[in-house]
Regions:
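A noncatalytic interaction/capping subdomain that flanks phosphate/NTP-handling catalytic cores
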Residues: 1-116, 126-136, 141-212
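Conserved glycine(s) of the Walker
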Residues: 118-120
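Hydrophobic positions on the alpha1 helix immediately C-terminal to the Walker A/P-loop
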Residues: 123
Length: 212
């Protein structure tokens, strides 16, 4: 039986919000998340035209309070503000985001993941230069399972790479990059190591025990 998809509506409200208090779940330079009885409140300190955003507990309704001024900068900020809500509802539908660069090789998507600065984009760009492999996304990839097979779904968020696609491709595998000054090698990890390393690279929401 196919699970029913959970949908999401995003409303833009061009006025100041009614400030809501709540329990702080996350706070960093770019995002603060508070929880209250009816849902979540999100604040985006670096996105000056985004006043505040509210989301129901199940993610079906999002209200973004923002400036009515239409500028290239404001639209870019709005695009970035929508991402956590999209990733929340994607996770509710069994799809998870992995910080990685991806390419298409032999009709399958291959992801290269590692810490920032590890060389994900350098690696995929070398594949393109040497073998002509198309690049799919330069920063973030959404993975899900359908009928026992894993797929990578195209999304528009791609960091500063400018590389993204709307295509859906079968997942070939995930290469987890490391660094060793003395040697270049491949290692086959144990199942437990694979799960742990991939989870460390996930961008999907993990604000509460339920989301983890």
């Amino acid at each position: 039986k196919t699970a029913q998809k959970i949908t999401q509506e995003i409303h833009l409200i061009c006025q100041s919000p009614t400030k809501q208090n709540g329990t702080v779940l996350l706070r960093n330079r770019e995002l603060s998340i508070l929880e209250h009885a009816d849902g979540y409140v999100m604040l985006f300190p670096t996105l000056k035209n985004i006043f505040e955003a509210h989301m129901t507990k199940d993610g079906h309704l999002v209200q973004i309070y923002c400036s009515s001024a239409v500028t290239e900068s404001n639209l870019e900020n709005l695009f970035h503000a929508i991402r956590p809500f999209f990733l929340f509802i994607a996770q509710k539908n069994g799809k998870f985001a992995v910080h990685s660069a991806s390419l298409l090789y032999k009709e399958k998507a291959w992801l290269f993941s590692g810490h920032s600065g590890m060389g994900k984009s350098t690696h995929t760009n070398l594949w393109k230069e040497l073998f002509g492999t198309p690049l799919l996304n330069g920063d973030l990839n959404l993975i899900g399972e359908e009928n026992g097979q894993f797929f990578v779904y195209g999304i528009p968020w791609c960091g500063t790479s400018g590389i993204c696609t709307t295509e859906k491709q079968r997942l070939g595998g995930i290469v987890l990059l490391g660094r060793d000054a003395k040697d270049n090698r491949f290692e086959i990890m144990t199942p437990a190591e694979r799960v742990l390393r991939v989870m460390q690279r996930m961008i999907s929401p993990s604000w509460t025990d339920e989301l983890v």
